[in-house]
């Protein structure tokens, strides 16, 4: 067994579960039989770039994105962000002009038709997809948006609440949500500007996001769930331990429910299923034993996936 990990990212591709084990690599598990299929390490023939895996995600085109914590080597591609296409690894470029601007700690990855996004220790970064009509085409680093106000990106400063971006999610055409340790931002990736910033009143180690209709739900540790209306550009009242939706302010996970208009929130309070339309609680399970409910681990959930009828 592997215990007391700081994180254990998970991704599911059909019948295969990819489980990231920081310091070891990626464990492959058969989802139907629970058998261990393989363990990818840097010493394996597939040559996983680094064993300190922080984040995993299946990308828009079906590849596996792997974000790791690596050495700041200054190389064109330091191996912190890699893509497995089913037969080969592709290392995404990480070199940014200037001193000590290269991202080398990758906390979250996501993608859409426009590109790949990563939350890093140097901001929220975007890569353009290779040209599918050119076999020699490679990923290109579009920009990294970071803290400070001098403009220019690439370490120059773009007005982000913090350079440590721990969550990235596309939330609309050319719009990227970036959650940081000190707040959140919305980035227009088409013109490279930070268009909305929310500064937290406390440091947070997580910044989860879920979008339903025209509202963005932001889950933070220590702060509860902040809500932002995209149409009006205004903040709604937050959901925390005093609002009756959550029993505690520490939110570690947000994920869409199986029914439209529902959302699961996880944290120190356990798991809560929320009806977003009526702003009511549909189910609430504490950590540990629950009468007429499941027995949950005694720790706050770090990742949640729903596949078919299983969470």
What are these regions (language model features)?
Residues 16-19, 63-65, 115-118, 175-178, ...:
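Conserved beta-propeller blade signature
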Residues 24-28, 78-82, 123-125, 183-185, ...:
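A short loop-to-beta-strand structural motif that recurs across blades of beta-propeller domains
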Residues 37-38, 90-92, 142, 195, ...:
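A structural motif specific to WD40 beta-propellers
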Residues 22, 69-71, 76, 121, ...:
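Short loop/turn segments immediately following the C-termini of beta-strands
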Residues 1-27, 31-38:
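An edge-strand/N-cap motif at the start of beta-rich repeat modules
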Residues 1-13, 43-57, 61, 93-111, ...:
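Short coil-to-beta transitions that initiate beta-strands within beta-rich domains
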Residues 30-34, 84-88, 129-133, 188-192, ...:
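Short loop/turn segments that connect beta-strands within beta-propeller blades
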